Swiss-Prot record:
Belongs to the LysE/ArgO transporter (TC 2.A.75) family. This is Putative amino-acid transporter YggA. It comes from Aeromonas salmonicida. One of its GO terms (cellular component) is plasma membrane. It is found in: Cell membrane. Disulfide bonds: none annotated. The keyword Iron does not apply. GO terms for molecular function: amino acid transmembrane transporter activity. The chain crosses the membrane at residues 1-21, 37-57, 65-85, 116-136, 148-168, 185-205. Its main location: membrane. It holds the Pfam family LysE. NCBIfam families: 2a75. It comes from the Bacteria.
Amino acid sequence: MFATTLQGFTLGLAMIIPIGAQNAFVLSRGIHRNHHLLAATLCCLCDLILIGIGVFGGANLLAASPIGLALLTWGGVLFLCWFGIRSLRSAWQGQGAALADSPRLMGVKSVLAMTLGVTLLNPHVYLDTLMLLGSFGSQFAEPLRPAFAAGAMLASLVWFYSLAFGAAALSPWLARGRVQQAIDTIVGLIMLGLALQLASGALLAS
């Protein structure tokens, strides 16, 4: 049982740790101590639900709906392009931008909307949780699947809260003007790169 949980935890971390839209957004909220725990909590909740659905048979739902997957993919492309351009604009404005005009600080509703956007409009999230974790988890006997799912869910909790708390703890250094400009630039390029990757994959598959 413990070995199965450890497998779920290890595979879950392997899926979550590579930089992506969720990680970049939680990191940016942590740097500004701007509802970072809210963002981390919502990312975790979405992951817990999707991991549970995937491990207990939901992987077939995504595979059986190519039209839905295509709509999700292109919606994700548009969202990631918007997010990337927004981050690059913030980097370009730099320290001279007025705080009121800066996209770096957000209200609760904006953080909720953005977190749901980088999660539910991100096809990689579904591929990781529903397809990969779901397919791997389905190989276990039914009595062991809850242990595997628990391990993967624990990985999500540990990672997102560590990222949020770590970014907040290092915010005095990370929030410096030039450092923040560099982070905004990197995040923007990552978002545009993910959008390009999604778009090219969708075009090749069509």
